[in-house]
Every structure is written in C-alpha cells, then in structure tokens.
Design a protein with these regions (language model features):
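Metal-dependent nuclease catalytic cores that hydrolyze phosphodiester bonds in DNA/RNA
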Residues: 1-130
Length: 130
C-alpha cells in the first residue's frame, strides 16, 4: 500500500494560520440538493449539485425507455456505489487499512482502478475533505 505524506506545516505562516482557523462548514439538504453554509450564512452548492444541472436529455430518454422503477433502482444503486468508492478513497489517502473494504466487490474494484491510475500520482496531501 502507498503511504501518503500529510503535510501539516506548509512553511507559509500566513497560509498555516488560515488553515488552522478555518471553521467547519455546515451543510443543509433541500430537495435532495446539498449546500455548504459559511459562517456568514452564504450557501454554496456541492459539486454533485453543480454537475447535476447539466443537460439531462439523455438521462430522461433512458428513464422513459426503462421506466421509473428500473431507473430509480439503477440510480440509487449507482449513488450508493459512488459513496462507497468515495469513502474508500478517503480511507486510502488517510493511510487506513483497506482490508475491510474488500467485501464490497464492485466498489472495491472501481476504487482499485482509481488507485492504480490516479491516486498513485498523489504524494503530499496539504488539505483534505473531512
């Protein structure tokens, strides 16, 4: 397993001070849309929300072709799989033991593709989503 170096001192005092005082952002979900809320009360959409705004014509044609029940099942399954892969990536970057994830065959296979092609190019980690 690759071991990632988590850099805690960037040798840039001003940036270190900012990183140490960053508040934890709160989140709210409205109609299945997640927003991050700043201490000033500003709401910013999650990347998933931003990407979901893209043209959905192809997805709507697919949904019409397969029906709502199948489309909902496939969408829900894909979302759960994506969440599992996301957690695996976080654990991997945090140098955690990946053994417990092996029981999730498909998400683990997808994670391994990411690890082999993308995550392997990461060395120093300066900040990470919590």
């Amino acid at each position: 397993m690759t071991t990632f170096n988590h850099v805690s001192d960037l040798n840039i005092p001003e940036l270190n001070d900012v990183l140490m005082t960053l508040p934890e952002l709160k989140t709210k979900t409205f109609d299945r849309t997640r927003f991050y809320i700043t201490p000033e009360g500003n709401h910013y959409p999650s990347i998933t929300t931003v990407l979901s705004i893209r043209n959905k014509e192809g997805l709507m044609k697919w949904r019409k072709r397969v029906g709502d029940d199948v489309a909902n099942y496939v969408s829900r399954t894909a979302a759960m799989r994506g969440t599992k892969v996301h957690h695996m990536c976080e654990d991997y970057l945090n140098n955690e033991n990946m053994e417990r994830h092996k029981k999730e065959f498909l998400p683990y296979a997808l994670f391994n593709q990411l690890a082999d092609k993308a995550l392997c190019n990461i060395d120093n980690i300066y900040a990470q989503e919590c």
